[in-house]
């Protein structure tokens, strides 16, 4: 049991106090997120390491969505296998299993319960797709038109679009007619036919009506349906038979009420024909009165895009339920590296902040809240590095605003001067949208991602939502809730007392001092002290398990009679290499060959000044940490891989042999291997926590004292004075 779980009663009580403060201030904060999971017993499989897709991942996704629908007691939701992300080099969009429902509890689907299961139903007629489309045409009272039949796909295509004519909405349909001496032919591929329609063969026939974009869920009253000119509609509903399943592909409509009416017409058609169906295609357009969750694949993980909730107790119930249902399927939120060190899923656990609707988002109502969050995180590197994954730095998935582009701080301060309470959302995006990005200008890869706040060029993404991306997946629900509570408390504090201190110019100190466990934890203590002064008392003991996993102890031993030595993992901002040409185009690898660790020595306070630390034959500098402790940070070449930085002339500097001396009197030391102690690599991941712990023990070996020699002093660096970089050694 982790420390957060052990102290859960106190944490939950503080959550209630923070909630009371948020309610009293009228913040109206809603929080969601994107937690990720892996299969506990299949971590060697490529789909749970680097691949996004996989058969087992898909089946687990189906099961998890089914369990969450039941556990959350969703009111007759719409279940749909939608189209997810589509990245360059991938042959098709990834799947996205979704459940959508109305906030007011009214059923979104009024037919027999839907499923996203791949299980087949009873045998169906060969013309089932045609029967379904013909009946749907009658239910929607569409003009008689011959749909496009695609025998090779066992599919029927019905062009369909909600339009607006004379200020009244209506359904429109049309015939699709192939060009002379040709046939309409779907595009090749393995995706649903709805994504492979031959739209370019239809020509440039203009639709004489505007598409309907209504948003009122219940007042949409369409007039008589319209027969549009042939080939003028470029959207279509597709019904296809896949084995013994009938699947209905929903087109991407922008009118929310039209989408809902189409869904109800499909449900009625299914009931009339007594024909079970499975929905696929596009989800409902985003609307404040519609909620949804999705289960999607990402490289190595299964991601849950969880719906936002508006109070602490709902957040607790939701998070605990999610972890429980995932665990019941054999999913976990923790894994181990080959060398036994604990790590997160690798897929992150982003946190989203917003409101019940874009108009009530606290970030748009009070732009100074956004400034406070950005500024306070910039002042406290522990908030950036203390909860992130192993890959940090300017080229990671969530770089700090001052990483890689230090000149941005000046521009950011100018932008902050323009933020006012009466500023419209588009102006907020114009001021900050280009500044919160990584070194390549990617706005999604930023610690504070504004892609869903109010992007001017993407109206469909104007949700009033801020995404905090520098959060890795915690191993249990209590730790996840502690993270969420930390953010909620900071929001409550900044709402009452905006944080508007000038931004700090950390320079190289950011990647020197603030990569060590000691510096991160000291900085985090100051964060908790600020919150305590604001009236929100966090006990540092609640975070003990988190920091034990974030900075694992590599080994410790008692040497001599009154000295002790401890090694802990430190952070290393891995660089991204230059472009490399391969069969799929170009790619950029990550150089993970360097490691950094913290040496902590404890001894008699009156003799500490005589301490000397020798690492691989070099005397290295150390910094005092209290009266009786010394800390040294060592950076070294842990392994050599093709194409890594710097040149291959620096061989792996392993093992690390550390010896302590009091003056010239040897005290003892240790030997540390970053990988297997025979100098090789482990071939398989640990199969259990016990095996992982044993690998860690094997890689750390106490050493007896040796005789003093005149050890050379390792050259220091003005840029990184607190880091002993063994790559600077000679010989």
Protein language model features and the residues they cover:
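C-terminal accessory/tail domains of diverse enzymes
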Residues: 1-277, 285-300, 307-310, 314-345, ...
């Amino acid at each position: 049991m982790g420390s957060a779980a052990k102290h859960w009663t106190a944490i939950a009580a503080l959550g209630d106090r923070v909630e009371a403060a948020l309610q009293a201030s009228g913040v109206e904060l809603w929080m969601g997120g994107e937690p990720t999971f892996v299969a506990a017993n299949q971590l060697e499989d490529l789909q749970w390491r680097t691949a996004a897709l996989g058969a087992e991942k898909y089946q687990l996704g189906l099961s998890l969505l089914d369990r969450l629908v039941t556990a959350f007691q969703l009111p007759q939701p719409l279940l749909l296998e939608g189209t997810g992300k589509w990245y360059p080099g991938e042959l098709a969009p990834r799947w996205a299993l979704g459940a959508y429902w109305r906030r007011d509890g009214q059923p979104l689907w009024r037919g027999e319960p839907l499923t996203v299961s791949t299980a087949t139903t009873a045998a169906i007629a060969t013309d089932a797709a045609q029967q379904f489309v013909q009946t749907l045409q009658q239910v929607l009272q569409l003009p008689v038109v011959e749909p496009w039949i695609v025998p090779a796909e066992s599919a029927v295509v019905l062009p369909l679009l909600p339009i607006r004519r004379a200020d009244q909405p209506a359904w429109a349909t049309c015939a699709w007619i192939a060009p002379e001496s040709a046939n309409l032919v779907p595009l090749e591929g393995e995706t649903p036919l709805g994504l492979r329609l031959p739209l370019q063969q239809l020509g440039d026939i203009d639709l004489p009506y505007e598409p309907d974009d209504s948003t009122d869920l219940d007042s949409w009253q369409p007039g008589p349906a319209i027969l549009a000119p042939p080939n003028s509609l470029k959207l279509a509903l597709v019904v296809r038979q896949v084995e013994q399943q009938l699947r209905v592909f929903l087109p991407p409509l922008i009118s929310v009420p039209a989408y809902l009416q189409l869904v109800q017409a499909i449900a009625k058609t299914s009931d009339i024909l007594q024909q079970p169906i499975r929905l696929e295609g596009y989800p409902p357009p985003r609307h404040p009165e519609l909620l949804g969750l999705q289960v999607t694949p990402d490289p190595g993980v299964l991601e849950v895009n969880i719906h936002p909730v508006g109070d602490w107790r709902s957040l607790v119930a939701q998070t605990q339920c999610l972890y429980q249902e995932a665990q019941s399927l054999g999913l976990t939120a923790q894994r181990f590296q080959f060398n036994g060190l604990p790590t997160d899923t690798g897929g992150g656990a982003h946190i989203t902040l917003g409101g019940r609707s874009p108009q009530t988002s606290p970030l748009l109502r009070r732009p100074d809240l956004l400034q406070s969050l950005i500024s306070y995180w910039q002042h406290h590197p522990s908030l950036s590095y203390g909860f992130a994954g192993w890959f940090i730095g300017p080229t990671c998935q969530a770089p700090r605003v001052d990483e890689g582009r230090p000149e941005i701080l000046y521009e950011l301060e100018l932008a902050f001067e323009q933020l006012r309470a009466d500023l419209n959302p588009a102006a907020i995006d114009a001021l900050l949208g280009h500044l919160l990005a990584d070194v390549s200008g990617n706005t999604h890869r930023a610690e504070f991602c504004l892609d869903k706040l109010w992007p001017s060029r993407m109206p469909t993404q104007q949700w009033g939502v801020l995404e905090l991306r520098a959060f890795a997946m915690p191993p249990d629900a209590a730790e996840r809730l502690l993270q969420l509570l930390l953010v909620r408390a900071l929001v409550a504090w900044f709402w009452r007392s905006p944080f508007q201190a000038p931004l700090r110019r950390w320079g190289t100190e950011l990647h020197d001092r603030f990569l060590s466990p000691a510096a991160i934890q000291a900085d985090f203590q100051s964060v908790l002290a600020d919150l305590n002064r604001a009236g929100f008392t966090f006990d540092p003991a609640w975070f003990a398990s988190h920091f034990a996993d974030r900075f694992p102890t590599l080994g410790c031993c008692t040497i001599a009679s009154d000295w002790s030595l401890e090694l802990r993992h430190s952070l290393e901002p891995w660089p991204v290499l230059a472009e490399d040409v391969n069969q799929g185009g170009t790619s950029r690898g990550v150089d993970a060959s360097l490691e950094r660790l913290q040496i902590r020595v404890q001894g008699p306070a009156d003799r500490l000044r005589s301490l000397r630390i020798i690492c691989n034959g070099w005397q290295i500098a150390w910094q005092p940490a209290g009266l009786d402790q010394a800390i040294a940070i060592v950076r070294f070449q842990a392994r050599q891989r093709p194409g890594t930085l710097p040149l291959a002339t620096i061989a792996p500097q392993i093992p690390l042999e550390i010896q302590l001396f009091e003056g010239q009197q040897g005290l003892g030391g240790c030997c540390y291997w970053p990988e297997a102690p025979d100098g090789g690599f482990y071939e398989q991941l640990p199969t259990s926590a016990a095996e992982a712990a044993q690998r860690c023990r094997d890689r750390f070996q106490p050493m007896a004292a040796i005789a003093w020699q005149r050890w050379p002093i390792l050259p220091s660096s003005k840029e990184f004075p607190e880091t002993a970089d063994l790559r600077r050694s000679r010989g």
